[in-house]
Amino acid sequence: MATFTKIKSMYFPRDVLIGHNAIHQVVDVCQSLRFGKKGIIITGQDTYKAAGREVEERMSKDYDLKTIFTGNATPENVKEVSEAVKSHEATFMLAIGGGSKIDISKIVAKDLDLPFVSVPTSVSHDGIASDRASLKSDTGAQSVEAVAPTGIIADTTVINEAPYRFLASGCADVISNLTALKDWEFASWMTDEEMSSSAFMISKYAAENIIENSDRIKPGLEESVWLIMRPIIASGVSMCIAGNSRPTSGSEHMFSHALDVIRPNTALHGEQCGIGAIMMMHLHRGDWKRIKDSLIAIGAPTTAAETGFTEDDIIDALVMAKDIRKERFTVLGDKGLTRTAAKNLARVTKVI
């Protein structure tokens, strides 16, 4: 009999607080996690106004804090924040903002072996609780290994103040899990790729939960934020279990990353993934109309025109998608789509 040698490490958020005025308990969360007394707040100008200043004021009596203002998650900004953290001799970090501030903190936390608390001010994607980060460069966005936050404080009051477009984008990103899971299942059949059933089911729960509540997710309703936060966090946790982004990222994300290369900074990540999921579910011969109807109910875009892309952008991205992550087997296969097939796919799903 062969000797069993398998071993795996998984890191999850330990303290998750969701709800109305949740940041009022930031000191309690940090004390319960026993971080030490020297902290760094990583934020941006707008997100500092949204939540950073209040966190700073609430913690200043008990902690030696330094606030760092930064921008997009680029290698340069990661290095700058890392140097500031080391200079302050910080024992923990607080990431206050949208995706970029949390992504920077994830990478720095991994590099320096430091705990951090994620305090999202908007939820335009499902990365709040995951151990992956999106690092931007001139050639587009790259998913890199990082570390999940030790704690999460999701203040529904704060998040509800952000533009509703961000919330709808986060929902679309989680809904797109359905095609990622189809791709993962397909790869396990075709290539014997290992598939985690627990990560699979958690990711599926997250997507189905948002679809089932799609008619209750509306602009200006704090309850809408409450409804989606658990699925968004669960989606991130599924990646922690799998040890990669497979439960939440497949052909629809490859399409999205191709759009980032073709026409960067045109639409939000989740918006692009939602549109990609409509088309990729059609390739899987699944219920793509259910995805589209759910996105429409939420208020997320389902067409090129709604997101600022041209018909050629969509077609070019569909053709390019197969080359984004060649090691990841999806419904696109090795050869991908011809331009004619891509055009037909986008038209039959009414993306163009």
Where are these regions (language model features)?
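Solvent-exposed alpha-helices and their adjacent loops that cap or buttress functional pockets
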Residues: 8-10, 33-34, 85-88, 109, ...
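A short, small-residue-rich loop immediately preceding and capping a beta-strand
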Residues: 85-108, 112-123
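Active-site segments that bind and position negatively charged phosphate/pyrophosphate groups
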Residues: 197-298, 302-309
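C-terminal charged capping/lid subdomain of soluble metabolic enzymes
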Residues: 2-7, 11, 174, 285-352
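Short glycine/serine/threonine-rich phosphate/pyrophosphate-binding segments
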Residues: 48-51, 100-106, 125-128, 248
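ATP/NTP phosphate-donor binding region
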Residues: 1-92
